[in-house]
Amino acid sequence: MPEDAGPEAVRSGLPAAPEPADALDAADVPERADVQDTAAAPLVAAQERSVQLDAGWSVGPTGMRTRHAARVLLVDDQDRVLVVRGHDADEPSRHWWFTVGGGIDPGESAHEAAVREVFEESGLRVAPEDLVGPVVTRSAIFDFARESCLQHEEFFFVRLTHDGRLVRDGWTEIETGFIDEMAWLTTTELRATTDEVFPRDLPDIVDDLLAGWDGVVRAIGLERD
C-alpha cells in the first residue's frame, strides 16, 4: 500500500509490476480517431511483449492502436471516487491512478459499456439510468506494452447508494497483469499522491460534480498520459 494515501482510503490490493516510453508529441496529434501521425513508433513483435493489447484495439494507417472507451467517475456516500492503480507491464517503475472503465465493444453503446466495465472491474452493479452524462470527454495518448495508443473517452458520473465492497473476479488476464489495487480515495488524497493521476484534473472534476453538474460536457481535448 502506498504511503501517500490517507487513512480514509479503502483498498483492494493485488500483484505488483511495469511503465512507458516517450514516442509521440501529443501536440502533433489531432483530437479524434482520424489521427494523422508521422512519428508513430514501430509496433513491437507480440512475442517480445510481456502483455499484449486485446482485440478491442485497431491499428490505423498511422500504426497507432486506437479505440473508443467509456469511463466512470463512481463516487460513494463519503465523497470518495473509485480509482485504480496500475503500471505498464513492460516498465515496472511507473505507477498511476486512473478511473474505472474500458473499451466499447462492437454494437455496444457508451452507456452499456460503462455499466459492464464497472461490474467487471469492481463487482459493483449500476444501472444505465444511474449514469449522469457523459460529463467529460477527452482523448489520451499513452504508451503500453511498448506501443503508443490513442483512446477516445467518455466519462459518466455515478453516485453509489449501496455497499461499495470491491471484488476482482471479472478481471481479464491483461488487467491482472498491470493493475496493482483499487481504492476509494477522496479528492484530497488524490491531490496528495506522488503517483500520476489521469485525467490530470480528476480531483477538480470530481469536486465540481459533487457541487452539482451544470449539464455542460467538459471537453478536455487531447492529453498525453
Segments (PLM) and residue ranges:
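Acidic, metal-coordinating catalytic segment for phosphate/diphosphate chemistry
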Residues: 2-4, 41-77
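Nudix hydrolase/Nudix homology domain
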Residues: 2-10, 14, 163-225
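Asp/Glu-rich intrinsically disordered low-complexity tracts
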Residues: 3, 8-9, 16-40
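Short, P/G- and charge-enriched loop/turn segments at secondary-structure junctions
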Residues: 53-62, 142-146, 170-172
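Short, well-ordered beta-strand micro-motif
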Residues: 74, 85, 157-159, 183-189
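Conserved Nudix-box catalytic region and its N-terminal flanking loop in Nudix hydrolases
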Residues: 80-121, 125
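A short coil-to-beta-strand element that immediately follows conserved catalytic motifs
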Residues: 125-135
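Active-site-adjacent beta-strand/loop module that shapes the phosphate/pyrophosphate-binding cleft
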Residues: 138-169, 205
